[in-house]
Amino acid sequence: MGRRLKFLQKLAFLGQNHRYKALERDEVETLIDEQCELKAIEREKTVAALPPGEACKCSREELARAFHVDLDSGLSEFAVAQRRLVHGWNEFVTDNAEPVWKKYLDQFRNPLILLLLGSSVVSVLTKEYEDAVSIALAVLIVVTVGFIQEYRSEKSLEELTKLVPPECNCLRDGKLRHMLARDLVPGDIVSLSMGDRIPADIRLTEVTDLLVDESSFTGEVEPCGKTDSPLADGGDLSTLSNVVFMGTLVQCGKGQGVVIGTGEQSQFGEVFKMMRAEETPKTPLQKSMDKLGKQLTIFSFGIIGLLMLVGWVQGKPFLSMFTVGVSLAVAAIPEGLPIVVMVTLVLGVLRMAKKRVIVKKLPIVETLGCCNVICSDKTGTLTANEMTATQLVTSDGFHAEVSGVGYSGEGTVCLLPSKEVIKGFDNVSVGKLVEAGCVANNAVIRKNAVMGQPTEGALVVLAMKMNLGSIKDSYVRKKEIPFSSEQKWMAVRCGPKSEDGEDIYFMKGAFEEVIHHCSMYNNGGIPLPLTPQQKSYCQQEEKKMGSLGLRVLALASGPELGRLTFLGLVGIIDPPRAGVKEAVQVLSESGVSVKMVTGDALETALAIGRTIGLCNEKLKAMSGEEVEGTEQGALAARVRQVSVFFRTSPKHKVKIIKALQESGAIVAMTGDGVNDSVALKSADIGIAMGQTGTDVSKEAANMILVDDDFSAIMSAVEEGKGIFYNIKNFVRFQLSTSIAALSLITLSTVCNLPSPLNAMQILWVNIIMDGPPAQSLGVEPVDRDALRRPPRSVGDTILNRALILRVLMSAAVIIGGTLFIFWREIPANGTSTPRTTTMAFTCFVFFDLFNALSCRSQTKLIFEIGFFRNRMFLYSVLGSLLGQLAVIYAPPLQKVFQTENLSALDLLLLTGLASSVFILSELLKLWEKFLSRARPTQMLPEAV
């Protein structure tokens, strides 16, 4: 603006004085230069990033015009400076505007936490300082753990920034410079070579045998061959052969191109923006705890209101009744609940860690219990990400199948249908076919890993399975014609190493290209003329293998190109992981639907889907393009029936997950690539692969499978279901005990009767209620039958109707039994004695212990779950029992608790009466079992 103002002022001055002074030549030139510079600045500011779908259609000349760049000399420093003002640096900026202290305070925005804090304040006002400290400590522990989990989960954005390589080779002012990748702007000319990580989205203008590993971006395991020719149609990102994307890796060859998108304007920038905008959803357990907090709040205020009303009717002082009501309400709140929930979740996490599953966020453990949909990426998750040859067809009609997965060399080659295992050249036709694949090859297998292209590695392993792994050493390579995306084949010319002989060509590639170079076909080691009928037969076999989702390679050999002998076809696929098929079956039987969401083509996805039992006769598949074109509401209605989603981008995956969540599903997403990271974050449960997963996917996920074992999800689901039931067991015990204790005190207060329990006895009951017996219910081992149960509904709360009925039933039995003993032992004058309170007190404690025993399971009898299964529970109950006996019989404690000795008959009576709460609970379980058998067998809920 300063230059422009100066220029206009000078023009005005000259205009005023043109009659008196002629314009000097150097001034004219200066004005022209300044005017040109202003135009150049305006022009540079109009240069915009170009979407890959548009850039792929542009010719070299159109690209140069669009970005105002000379393809031979690159941008000038002046142009770069102006463009940076518009486009910024080529990097991702993480927004850390919210301070840490605010994030910590946000953890207190939880109804149960707020209720507990309120209880702590009331405890201080009523001078119950011990209660106040214990409640505050429990809240502090729970809040701190939650904060740490959330703080760690924000690292996924930081990991994504590591995908931008620190340096690159860029052409500027006619010179190739090694510079920081963050300096790139749209229009820069970047040079690429083998091993480079691509620094921005680039439209290629020059290519030499360029292969790019895009597996972290598209999910495709096979490297993509690249070209510099314009494309007629944009298509999806995985088909853009003349565009390379930020963060992907040059596997071989070299190239040069124009930067079309930097930073957040690149495709990885789109992923970054989606991850930044995506919020991790609340888990069902968090929602249940929130609801429980609200229910307990209503219950607490109900007690206060009821007592104040009764006190008002009886004419008692308002303040004293309010104080009693508040104290009882505080006592009713299970302050031990957050700690028990946390301990239960931590123990679940530790158990899962032993099964090689790492959980990063505690509530996620329980969320698995209500997961009813698992959306899984294909490559590296359902499959091993190890290309493997599975089928062979020779030119003379022999068919063979190959066993063994991966690059270990373990497995056999069997002729069909005889299942005869063949080695070496037992079958000449198969031997020659395998030999050609091994010799026309640049891959090396070392320590069960491939060095080179995965497809070539599969051919080397195939040779190893036939004891032909070293046959390549029998030849001396004299020439190589490398593979290119245009010709779709590669060939080598070799000579025998040990003896004089003629050179021979070995070729492999696409069938339609290889057959074009053949004039003969192999028939048991004898070359015969390649007739149209024979060619048609081979073409049909190639189509048949392709329809099974196999990558088909044709092989040939001969003295010269154009006179080769066709040898046959090899079918290669990335096979399913071991145990995946069984896991899918078990999950389906337990009401969990497994869906494949992949960037691969339909044929490949269906082949894997059929192999693992994902696809049935009513299979429905949906492309990423269809997902994008369908409105969210309509998509939510359709996704329930779809088993396979193919050709999907990161944006499509998120849309699919949102649609499933909208339809009421709890969705787990498994993945290993950067392209999965946004979906992993938006899903209710994000599951990343520990070995093959990228750092970005691991940080975005909240669960990691250390060994990449999909079947470990079964154990995780089982654990999640068991944990929720353990939490319900604890809540049932604590609420039934607290309601019974409160009711006894409330009834005695309202009816002007002596209290069955004194202050110290109530304190002892509270210790048992919140102490070891209660805590040990949270560590009950997971029920092995949990996996067979269908996923629980998201709407199911901890305090549901069935649990409330059980709580009220247990509380009623405890109240009735304790009042019976109190009434039986109270003297005729109605005054309470030490024996009266000792009997009532011991009766209540015994009821508590039997109630805890019945709360170990909501559905199974004690003999089914095993009396000695939870040893911590037994030790805690035994400790509580010994403590109670000490309170009764130890003279120092008798003075503190105002108790006296009881006879053996007294203890026998109390034990028999207290066991009624346990017996009644077991009878109720038997009755429910009888009713469930009487009803017709119900199907599991429809898989979502």
From Swiss-Prot:
* Amino acids binding Ca(2+): V330, A331, I333, E335, N766, D770
Query: Which residues does the entry place in the Cytoplasmic compartment?
Result: 1-104, 149-229, 313-329, 770-802, 854-872, 925-944
| PROSITE patterns from the UniProt entry | ATPASE_E1_E2 (PS00154)
Q: Which UniProt keywords apply?
A: ATP-binding, Calcium, Calcium transport, Cell membrane, Golgi apparatus, Ion transport, Magnesium, Membrane, Metal-binding, Nucleotide-binding, Phosphoprotein, Translocase, Transmembrane, Transmembrane helix, Transport
Q: Which residues lie on this side of the membrane: Extracellular?
A: 126-127, 251-291, 351-748, 824-835, 894-903
Q: What is the annotated localization of this protein?
A: Golgi apparatus, trans-Golgi network membrane; Cell membrane; Basolateral cell membrane
Q: Does the keyword Secreted apply?
A: no
Taxonomically, which superkingdom? Eukaryota
Please name the Pfam families in this protein's record: Cation_ATPase, Cation_ATPase_C, Cation_ATPase_N, E1-E2_ATPase, Hydrolase
Modification Phosphothreonine occurs at: T262
UniProt GO BP: mammary gland epithelium development; positive regulation of calcium ion import; protein localization to plasma membrane
Residues that bear Phosphoserine: S266
Q: Report the EC number(s), separated by commas if there are several.
A: 7.2.2.10
Quaternary data: Interacts (via N-terminus) with ORAI1 (via N- and C-termini); this interaction regulates Ca(2+) influx at the plasma membrane.
Give the protein's biological function. Answer: ATP-driven pump that supplies the Golgi apparatus with Ca(2+) and Mn(2+) ions, both essential cofactors for processing and trafficking of newly synthesized proteins in the secretory pathway. Within a catalytic cycle, acquires Ca(2+) or Mn(2+) ions on the cytoplasmic side of the membrane and delivers them to the lumenal side. The transfer of ions across the membrane is coupled to ATP hydrolysis and is associated with a transient phosphorylation that shifts the pump conformation from inward-facing to outward-facing state. Induces Ca(2+) influx independently of its ATP-driven pump function.
Q: What is this protein called?
A: Calcium-transporting ATPase type 2C member 2
Which species is the source of this protein? Mus musculus (Mouse)
